[in-house]
Amino acid sequence: MHNTTRRKMLGLLGLAPVVPFAAQLLAPSSAAAAAGGLSPRDKIRQRYLPNVELQTQDGKTVHFYDDLVKDKIVTLNFFYAKCEGICPTVTANLARVQNILGEHVGQDVFMHSISLKPEHDTPAVLKEYAQMFKAKPGWTFLTGKPDDIELLRRSLGFTNLDPQLDKDKSQHIGNVRYGNEPLMLWAACPGMGSPEFLAKSISWVIRKDKG
């Protein structure tokens, strides 16, 4: 696919090949530092990466930023176990991505899938779901309090400008956000894309991390 065509496609999806969460926050970094303000990285953390409490499929309590994202390369997507739409396809794609990335997952990159229906998706339900897709170590399935999940969804940009569409949880399950937190590199791509494309996109931020 030509670069121009790919950019147009990603634009239609509301995505971009590689974008900081908020480029406008990075511009005044020198002035902010001189004034003793927050660093660009801290601004991104404060605005887009809330440190909400979550539970893994193993019942472990974790905090989103401190335990899952800080100093890491991650993939982030939303789903729910009883989804009959595209969730299974996206999850199956991510399982293939995990296989393609191999030993990088759990070492260089960490995969996080977050339930949009925490009232149903208990750790036990998530564990069964993870097993169904043969998820390996390095891929965590997460649930939490509904208000915390909603804050996380909105902060990460999984939203629709139409309020009615935004209420529809199925509108927020088709994309995958990935990023290198310490380098402030964040992007997104369609979860229905080819696993090879997804893996290549994620590998880009891994290579950036290794210089």
Where are these regions (language model features)?
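A short beta-strand-turn-helix
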Residues: 53-73
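Thiol-based oxidoreductase modules, predominantly thioredoxin-like and allied folds used
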Residues: 108-121, 138-147
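C-terminal segment of N-terminal export signals and the immediately downstream linker at the start
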Residues: 23-55, 62, 104
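Conserved helix-turn-beta segment immediately C-terminal to the redox Cys motif
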Residues: 91-111
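Thiol-/selenol-based redox modules, centered on thioredoxin-like
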Residues: 166-211
